[in-house]
Amino acid sequence: MKYLFIAIILILYCSFTKADQKKFLVNMYDNDPLFSPDFENANGAQTGLVKKKLGSDGKPIPANYDMKDPNGNYYIKNATTFKSWFNEVAGVSILVPFELVLTQTAGSQNYYSYSNTSFFPLNELGWYNPSIKGDYEFKKYQDSNKKEQNFHFCMHASFIMSTNCKEVFKFKGDDDVWVFINDVLVLDIGGVHGVQDGTVDMANLPEKIHDSTNSKLGNCKNGTYPFDFFYCERHTKASNCLFETNMGFTCSYYDYCGICNGKGECCTDVKLNQCYTKKCPLPNSLPNGATNYQDYMTIVPTNTCGGTDKCKIYSCNNSTGCEFKQKSCDDGDKCTKDACDSKTGYCSNIPTNPSVVTSCLKSGCDSTTGNYSTPTNCDDKDPCTIDSCINGQGCVHTKACDDEDPCTTDSCSADGKCTHTAIAKCNSDCPSCPSKKCKITSCSEDSGACNYVDMVFASPSECYKATCDPETEEAIYSPIDSSCDTSDSCFTAQCNLNKTCTRVPAINCDDNNECTTDSCSGGSCSNTAIACDDNDPCTIDTCSPSEGCIFTPIVCEQTSLCNTFTCSVGKCVPTPITCSSSVKCQDSICREGVGCVYFNRTCPPDDDCSSAYCSMETGKCISKAYDPLPFSCQSTAVKVGVGIGAAAAAGIAIGGAVAAGLAIFGGKKAYDTWKTSRGNVMTGSQSNPLYTQNQNNGNNPLYSAPAE
């Protein structure tokens, strides 16, 4: 009798309960061994084929290339072949949308499952679509029942889940399966293999899925996360895909392709020419769920045509692509050497030779001709002097009318004419007197004796005294003050009124470059590069010949919609963007390639016998036991049919199917007690047809009249 009761209870439960469904449009990618060597290789199960974090495109990244099984078969040949697994690649894989229908598990409100032991969703689709197949001759593959099937495909299903770290996801099937939560790998069943199973237990995750540093949280933290399910069928002769979960999968958005949390993969960028591309819009950017993405495509540059040589000016030619011309640093000065620094792009215009200034020479450069060396002009405009320049002293102006006759007086007129007037009683026939170094010889008219007078030389300035060189009888000019010493050829001395000198550069070593320190030593110029270092690793230190040191902050390229990149210790470091909402019961999350998305909060229940919702008053989740409870949540007494009436009389909450069992086996009183405990939803016992009196005045054997 007990077993009959249980059977009736189950029959009634199933008949009174309509299975709920959740439908999600996901992406399938049809491959074929004709194009991809990764398919139809019997290489066995293998973990570690993909990295533990999803790539920036939200797809797995292969971790081992050229890895082979003992028979020499590839697991994954290379990154190029792997790309077609979860991407549409022209001539290799074809994108096909697929409706994944999850069915509520019988006897449980919170569990949903998918079960297919003959999982061939792409038969007559993808490469096997007659309109696409064309002239390709595909090998025909059969299952164990000799039926032709499309075995070679992959699937990516993306959901959003809210967790309190109690949920589970159970999978059973073949071949590759990878599950990522918040982009972190939590289930790895890779390789071509027979049916295998695996479980994601949120309470015991193998990897940390959150960023909190609180060690007490473990690998799971209550919150909302993306859930990505990657599946591949890569080999004959069976295809199984079964999973069950109480993770409340939802979609944060649908892209314009209709895909749950999709990346807009039905849209393909169109290359217009060598320089411009018509780019697809962001997956969730169309207004009001529109699907006409073609109207929202934008034209963007295909090639930035940049290069490492900053002395080249790059541009793009629509026909030929990138081209460049050399940057001009010509300053129009023929006395400079023009150059461009390929690392910085700065121009330098360095003098070809430094300007040399001495007492008698100005070695400058004529910017229009490029000619050098200009003698010092010592012309004093006096016709009565002979103008010359003595190196180290400068200009010397010697009287022009000296006839070297001791018996004449020499003079010069304003027009430069010399006059030599004889000196009276001067004996020019004086006997020959022996010469003496640095002496002027004369003879006395009266005595005929030789007279010697020291040679006197005119000094070029008040700062020098002139003496006679006893060897050459030429003038030697010595500085009166040490400040007038010109032994260093890098300087010349400028005489002051107080008979001291001011040292001024004799050689111009300025190379017109703010990036060098200019100096002179031993008559030679030195131009030493300065060090531009501000000790900040987040600046690019360069030097401009016209401006000197320039410290340019490193600007990090913003390549992500979910991270902001800033410089730290010389590297661009991502900081996650916080997507927050002030609207109660609205959740938010950031998806790479999409940005921030906002959606109604889904609350995880406390257990499998409860449902949860978000309170619009508090914005917090509230978990509440199902009423009536699902059969699986009933007490043992109810499940086995022991003491049914007592259970109802005791006020145990039970469902309609069990209530029907009570009506059959527990008697009307038990049923009435259950009905009363339901809050008088029914108005009377007559609401149950099993307890309605026979309208033909006959006896209903299951009906007992109310006690008087």
UniProtKB/Swiss-Prot annotation:
UniProt entry keywords in alphabetical sequence: Developmental protein, Differentiation, Glycoprotein, Membrane, Secreted, Signal, Transmembrane, Transmembrane helix
One of the Pfam families matching this protein, by short name: PA14
Membrane topology: Single-pass type I membrane protein
Topology feature Extracellular, residues: 20-643
Region (Disordered): 682-708
GO biological process: cell differentiation
UniProt subcellular location: Membrane; Secreted
GO CC terms, sorted: extracellular region; membrane
Primary subcellular site in the record, as a coarse category: membrane
Positions with biased composition (Polar residues): 682-702
UniProt xrefs under SMART domains: PA14
Domain PA14, chain residue ranges per copy: 103-263
Residues with attached carbohydrate: 78, 116, 222, 317-318, 371, 498, 600
InterPro entries given in the database record: Fibro_Slime (IPR011874), PA14/GLEYA (IPR037524), PA14_dom (IPR011658), Prespore-cell_inducing_factor (IPR051154), S_mold_repeat (IPR001673)
Membrane spanning residue stretches: 644-664
Signal peptide start-end: 1-19
Cytoplasmic side: 665-708
Family: Belongs to the prespore-cell-inducing factor family.
Subunit details: Forms a complex with dicB.
UniProt miscellaneous comment: According to PubMed:15947191, it is secreted in the conditioned medium. However, prediction tools clearly predict a transmembrane domain. In some conditions, it may be cleaved and secreted in the conditioned medium, which would explain the discrepancy.
Functional note: Acts as a quorum sensing protein regulating discoidin gene expression during growth and development. D.discoideum is a single-celled amoebae and switches to multicellular development when food becomes limited. As the growing cells reach a high density, they begin expressing discoidin genes. The ability of psiF/dicA to induce discoidin gene expression when present in conditioned medium, suggests that it allows cells to sense their local density.
Name assigned to this protein: Protein psiF
